[in-house]
């Protein structure tokens, strides 16, 4: 195993030429390190480095929550983590189907035959051999080697499972940020990985999500006893990490329903619903207006239960 790991590291050193990811793992809890992406859209300049993913040191291996946007990104992340503990990767758990979170999977599958876990829609919507938005947005140098690989296991129901001595709870919540989201909780460490159900420091993109689904998911997350919460995007990992998301979706629901009552119509809703409390957050100008339009379409005929 040692010789194989040395060979992998030598291969990494050679293959990381060209586009360079400058990654630095941050320790967030005992035996948990995360890589935090930029609060930007994916671009040629950032190589898709705009989401968070984490390494958990288990008994004899690393277990990952998401894997990043490219093969080369995953290489760079593993190279940094091998400096902390020289361990293989045994499992990669994906939180949802958006490609900035899982296109690093094939690095871990090829190098370690890691078991890949995630939502069924990921396999249904992305087939081997296809190109995703990252293939279209990023430079060839950054995306080189990145391939879609099938998951080994689909997460369909709430379950607690022990992987290499570490206990994880998988909590599927249905359509929240994406068409089907899962968050992961480590009860022994009191660490929760929310995926994109929680973001902070930036505005979320709700292009495939639901306001009601987000609020439902956030209510479930709030019931868990966590000391650390890792958002899908953002740097706040404290007990207050989800406050921005709760405020945003609560206000969005309230104001959209007021707009419906005022009969603004879809064309006039953005003049009525401005969400100015969030105007200083990253990507507000880019994402807030589409979120308002989508929320109006969702809630136009909503009746409070």
What are these regions (language model features)?
Residues 36-50, 135, 142, 201-210:
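Acidic/histidine-rich helix-loop elements
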Residues 30-80, 184-194:
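Conserved beta-strand hairpin/beta-sheet module of binuclear metal-dependent hydrolase folds
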């Amino acid at each position: 195993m040692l010789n194989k790991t040395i060979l992998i590291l030598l291969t990494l050193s050679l293959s990381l030429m060209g586009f360079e990811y400058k990654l630095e793992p941050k320790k967030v809890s005992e035996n948990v390190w995360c890589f935090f992406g930029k609060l930007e859209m994916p671009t040629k300049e950032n190589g898709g480095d705009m989401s968070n993913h984490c390494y958990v040191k288990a008994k004899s291996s690393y277990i990952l929550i998401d894997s990043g946007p490219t093969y080369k990104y995953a290489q760079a992340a593993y190279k940094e983590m091998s400096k902390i503990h020289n361990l293989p990767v045994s499992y990669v758990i994906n939180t949802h189907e958006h490609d900035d979170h899982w296109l690093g999977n094939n690095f871990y599958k090829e190098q370690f035959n890691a078991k890949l876990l995630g939502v069924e829609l990921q396999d249904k919507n992305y087939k081997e051999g296809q190109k995703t938005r990252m293939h279209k947005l990023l430079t060839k140098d950054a995306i080189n080697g990145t391939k879609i690989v099938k998951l080994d296991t689909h997460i369909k129901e709430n379950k607690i499972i022990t992987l290499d001595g570490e206990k994880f709870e998988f909590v599927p919540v249905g359509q929240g940020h994406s068409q089907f989201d899962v968050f992961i909780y480590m009860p022994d460490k009191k660490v929760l990985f929310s995926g994109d159900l929680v973001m902070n420091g930036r505005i979320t993109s709700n292009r495939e999500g639901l306001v009601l689904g987000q609020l439902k998911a956030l209510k479930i997350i709030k019931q868990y006893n966590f000391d650390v919460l890792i958002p899908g995007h953002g740097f706040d990992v404290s007990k207050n990490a989800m406050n921005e998301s709760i405020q945003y979706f609560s206000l969005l629901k309230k104001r959209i329903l007021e707009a419906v009552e005022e009969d603004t119509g879809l064309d006039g809703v953005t003049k009525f619903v401005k969400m100015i409390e969030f105007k200083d957050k990253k990507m507000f100008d880019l994402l807030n207006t589409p979120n308002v339009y989508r929320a109006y379409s969702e809630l136009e005929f909503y009746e409070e239960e």
